[in-house]
Amino acid sequence: MGRKWNNIKEKKASKDANTSRIYAKFGREIYVAARQGEPDPELNQALKAVLERAKTYNVPKSIIDRAIEKAKGGSDESYEERRYEGFGPNGAMVIVDALTNNVNRTASDVRAAFGKNGGNMGVSGSVAYMFDRVAVIGFEGKTADEALEILMDADVDAKDIIEEDDTVIVYAEPDQFHAVQEAFRNAGIEEFSVAEFSMIAHNEVTLSEDVQAQFEKMIDAIEDLEDVQQVYHNVDLA
């Protein structure tokens, strides 16, 4: 199960190295999570999960604090969660999650990013049934067998555990996100390189070099949109 998480994170880090784009996206997501519940992560599981993910991207504390204070301050700025589904070259499947304060603008922008790069936006439900939502936790310092033993001792279930380079990647049901992290923290793991909720495709597809280049250009165009928070797909980019 899964994708090359280290490769994905390295690509994102390289892409965002000279911009504040990723911080702006996290700022928005943190604000929305804090506004929808308590601004205290210990009392708000959604906010806690966003903050755990933000740590893996080294989001500055100032960005996090500003977003939470904005939510505390009673800002009337509101965002809606929207999911768009579509197809890339050769029928590759794509899911786009967005937070927007203008649904018409975002839908138009996402549709254009698909259309200008060899893809097309589909209707709701056209591809999501081919993906499963999972929690993904990654860390160094243990083997897959050791990770399994830790989870078994803590009575926490995992869907799959793999080793990728020097990193152990654990896939679990979404409602086990915090339980998995807590089990490993109790076993001495202090830092996580991956802490995500993801949509994992049932089956991945491989594209030819030229088609893959076009597909990656399309994904980049979608990810560059201000309102887009996450993009998932079923293409093996290894």
UniProtKB/Swiss-Prot annotation:
SUPFAM superfamilies: YebC-like. The keyword Transcription applies. Belongs to the TACO1 family. YeeN subfamily. NCBIfam families: PRK00110.1, PRK12378.1, YebC/PmpR family DNA-binding transcriptional regulator. Gene3D superfamilies: 1.10.10.200, 3.30.70.980. GO terms for biological process: regulation of DNA-templated transcription. One of its GO terms (cellular component) is cytosol. This is Probable transcriptional regulatory protein ABC1956. One of its GO terms (molecular function) is DNA binding. It holds the Pfam family TACO1_YebC_N. Keywords: Cytoplasm, DNA-binding, Transcription, Transcription regulation. InterPro entries: Integrase-like_N (IPR017856), TACO1_YebC-like_2nd/3rd_dom (IPR048300), TACO1_YebC_N (IPR049083), Transcrip_reg_TACO1-like (IPR002876), Transcrip_reg_TACO1-like_dom3 (IPR026564), Transcrip_reg_TACO1_YeeN (IPR026562), YebC-like (IPR029072). It is found in: Cytoplasm.
